[in-house]
Amino acid sequence: MKDLSIVFHTPEIPGNTGNAIRLAAVTGAHLHLIEPLGFDLTDAKLRRAGLDYHDLAHVTVHPSLEDAWQTLGDRRVIAFTTHAQTSFADVEYRSGDVLLFGRESTGLPDEVVADPHVDLDVRIPMLPSRRSLNLANSASIAVYEAWRQHGYPGGS
């Protein structure tokens, strides 16, 4: 889904970002990474998780969230957080949507969820008393739901 963007806000674990690179490559989504990153982009774990898909993915690293907003322009931003009331599955995803995810240890900061660029916040349901899902898994669940709703354009 070439017009869909995934944003990882200050990710910490290279393997998760490597998996997201692979996700972007196989779905056509664009991956945006907001610094500071908890790893170097040449990290062996990142490279291993992304396998040979790095050259097939569109990845942009931004020095700040503000820089990402400028690049992304006026697009609908959906923040994924465990604190939201709306399920991700209840959203009608649109062409050009931006799916925003927080760092592995803390999720999205409250000030990011409250940022005026964020249009809605959603959650991925899970059992009570569970803290969170893995970042790369959460992104995969969301991207595939958005792609499914559009009939998997370009997919086979």
What are these regions (language model features)?
Residues M1-S156:
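Post-transcriptional modification and biogenesis factors for structured RNAs
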